[in-house]
């Protein structure tokens, strides 16, 4: 599948997402395409959950006088003791640098610290967890405060 994005002008980029649903090792892989160029973004495999990883949201964050940021949000459902039960969310952030009819990306996910991934549900000993960055609006609020 593909998602059109407006980074510098209308629909100038797209995220291409392909998934392999093999029983042995399902995965999802994402690329950013623009200016006749494709760049690998990320790849997620099953990682022990009950269902394969899903790319649930893609967006661009713009801040005046700053490079745009591509946001990707993945989720995976986990279930049943002795595992945690709920949804694991994974956030990726990429700064997009424009240069001479080309572009490059810089992975800035580490700026989230431990907040780049988390459980929204219950762990194996019954403690409840709420992951705060499980939607684009929450991620953009975080970027409003922290993207310098």
Regions found by a protein language model. Name each.
Residues 59-69, 95-102:
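A short, structured loop/turn motif at beta-sheet edges
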Residues 1, 6, 52-63:
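Beta-propeller blade termini
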Residues 2-5, 23-31, 76-95:
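Structural motif
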């Amino acid at each position: 599948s593909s998602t059109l994005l407006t980074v510098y002008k209308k629909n100038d980029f797209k995220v291409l997402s392909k998934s392999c649903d093999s029983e042995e090792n399902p995965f999802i892989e994402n690329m950013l395409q623009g200016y006749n160029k494709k760049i690998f973004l990320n790849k997620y495999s099953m990682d022990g959950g009950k269902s394969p990883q899903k790319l649930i949201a893609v967006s661009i964050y713009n801040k005046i006088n700053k490079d745009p940021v591509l946001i990707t949000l993945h989720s995976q459902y986990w279930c049943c003791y002795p595992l945690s039960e709920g949804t694991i969310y994974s956030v990726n952030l990429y700064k997009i640098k424009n240069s001479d009819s080309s572009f490059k990306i810089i992975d800035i996910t580490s700026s989230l610290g431990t907040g780049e991934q988390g459980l929204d549900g219950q762990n194996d000993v019954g403690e409840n967890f709420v992951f705060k960055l499980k939607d684009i609006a929450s991620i953009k609020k975080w970027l409003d405060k922290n993207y310098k």
